[in-house]
Amino acid sequence: MINIEDISKSSNQSEEKQLKSTSSKTKYPFAAKSLFKGSNNITPYYLSTSNTFQCVASESIQTWLLSDDGHIFTSSGNFVLDVSSGGYFVELVQLNSNSKTQIWTIDTTNNKIQNQGNGKYLDIDNLNICVAPLNGNATQKWTTFRRAPIPTGNWGYFQSKKLDSNNNYWGLSVLNNSTSYNTSVVMNKVQAKSIGQIWQMTNDGHILSRLDGNLVLDIGPSINGSKTNYYLNTNVYKANDLMQQWGINENNQIFNQYYPNLCIGFVGELGVDSTVNCVLAQPTSAGNINFQWIANPTYSLNQIVSEVPEPFPAYTSGDLLASYQYLSNIATNGYTDDIRSLYTSINVSLEIFYVNVTNATCPSSIHSTEDFSNVQNQIKNELTYAINVRLVFDNYSDFYSKLFSQGSTNLTNLANLINVDMSSDQVVNGDYTDAITSVFYAIISEIPIGGSIIANIGESAVEFGELDAESNDSGPSTYQVTLSKLYDHLNENYENEMANAQSMKNTILQDWGMMSKTFALCFLPTNNPSSLNINGLDFQKISTIASIAYQTAMIQMLLPTNYQIYFTPAGYYAPVSSDDYSYTDSTGTYIMAEIDNCNSHPPKALTDKLWNNGVSKQEVFTSSYGWNLATSVTYYNMVGKYSGMFKLSFPTVKNFTSVPMQFVMTNGSDRVGTFNVKTHFAGLASTYYYSGALGHHYYDIAVIDINGNKVANFTVDNNLEALEGSYVSIKTNSLVVQPGYVVGNPTCNQGSFSQGFAASILIPIYKSN
């Protein structure tokens, strides 16, 4: 069964509109707010997929997709609302096109949602959703309105809506970019390369810092002992801790789940001091700008293309129709009497059309000069809007095509540096969406003011394509591809992304409402996160940053095919002769070398492409964020038990999600160890264990998330042969993955008898749609 959620946990409310659609494949997002106010007679509630009443703040669980035929899908599109077999409670199930109990009618006039299978109405029973005969109670009254989900899952800034006296934006910042827990979160001017200002809002309402895995926004100490005023801190990610869960309401306020009446604001004057304190307090009013925030990028195009279609003004008869057809013929030199059909055509000049329409005069055959003038002004407006919308997308397409124009050559050059055979059938984890998302992240982190325009268009195109793929039940997994097919895979996805942007542009150009809203964004100041104003953008700088980021993404895909990390725990000898291929922290020393030779390191020409371009050594050597190198454990020049390292294999679980995980490794009834895996980090099972005799030895691994939910189970096969390093693999048919997750291709590297290092295996885990 499903529940309703407190309205204080909701996000942006939109203008209420009649819900409708024009295509059987199209699904429009909406939210449903109950007019029932609960026992306190104050708090209304949202229809929610949450399993518990006070669970989360994310808008995704309160956003639904209405299809043309009356199905109500979850925001992911995986499940639909249905009436249970008992005919009372409402539940989420797989789509069954033949089931009428999955069809609903939303009556926005009378605020009712009726089930077509049994004729009953959506109702509330002790915060659970049910259906019941019409009874007139407030529990059966629902206000439905349009909205698009807030940007979750992508990195960006949280900026105050209030600018300083020099029109600079200020944003949430971790003090001094510290990765230590209980560090103050303050306000600083938004700056390039300030990783402490980059955050990610997760689907359950946590706000992750890009500084480190598991580092989240939390409530800090009380201000002068107050129960309603607190500072903000960072802290370690905790399970089911409402103080670490946040939401964004209709007033663009970031509120806390534990204290839903308290919101994030700041005390002080922006621009006077270099750092301003953030507070959690109750705003003096809904419009208090010190408590209002903007996500950067806003992905404003996502919201626009999810709007209810708004057709162009209709001219169906009389002088209005005659004026429209006459002006269409004049504009196009007799080509068509329907000029709107050409707004999406790439082979026409809308600028020439505009001049022709402007110079046209009312012919004697049209009696109403007022009708003619009204149509003429409307067409001029449409052409003005269309010209500017096309210009934005044309500039994006030009940027995007230049980025990938040397794709084949660049991939070949990198393959030669890494010593990869691009004709082989070796499988790599080559997710294109992750690669292009990393490009947009690089742009906004290097150019926070203006770079968000490119990210706005690009990420919106990605989302637009994914929604289209869901509607058409298409889109195979992109997490695994052979080297011989990698370029074709990347090129195909590049073309798909170009097509997605083109399709989104055409969707906007064919809808008066979408075109009007997009045009308005074209003239916002460039520093506005919602802006599409490309005037003054330094495309050369943007292209340089994007090219480096895409090159790095390609290295991330190719590097694990020939290199791995050799880890030596702290206190033991490790032969380091160059910082180019090594990294040391408090846990030990990490050395990058070939997978079959721990003494053969990557060439300087390759490492220069990393370190000279600002790539984090910590992220590379610990397989954090986009990096996924397998890790072998080795003890150099050791005797005794450590001389048998070649008999062992050490699994690494790479967590590509925003939820902390842990995995338990067992051998029969013996527990080898429990290992934590931070968000976007890798966890290495580095515990030394007894390997046994020659032959196959099996180790079971169970992966769960921080809330105790199962993620995946599999068995590692550690095969010992005489005078050889161990062979490691995932035992056939042992992998079980829970819904909502995808396990990528494991990287399996043999150990070495002669060099004394262990086998390594890395298992990447992704969140699926």
Curated annotation (Swiss-Prot):
GO terms for biological process: response to cation stress. GO terms for cellular component: cytoplasm; membrane; nucleus. It comes from the Eukaryota. InterPro entries: Ca_Up-reg_Membrane_Reg, Ricin_B-like_lectins, Ricin_B_lectin. Induction: Induced by high levels of extracellular Ca(2+). Residues 1-22 are annotated as: Disordered. It is found in: Cytoplasm; Membrane. Keywords: Cytoplasm, Lectin, Membrane, Repeat. Residues 25-145, 158-296 form the Ricin B-type lectin domain. Gene3D superfamilies: 2.80.10.50. Its main location: cytoplasm. PROSITE patterns: RICIN_B_LECTIN. It is a peripheral membrane protein. GO terms for molecular function: carbohydrate binding. Coiled coil: none annotated. Signal peptide: none annotated. Belongs to the cup family. May play an important role in stabilizing and/or regulating the cell membrane during Ca(2+) stress or certain stages of development. This is Calcium up-regulated protein C. It comes from Dictyostelium discoideum (Social amoeba).
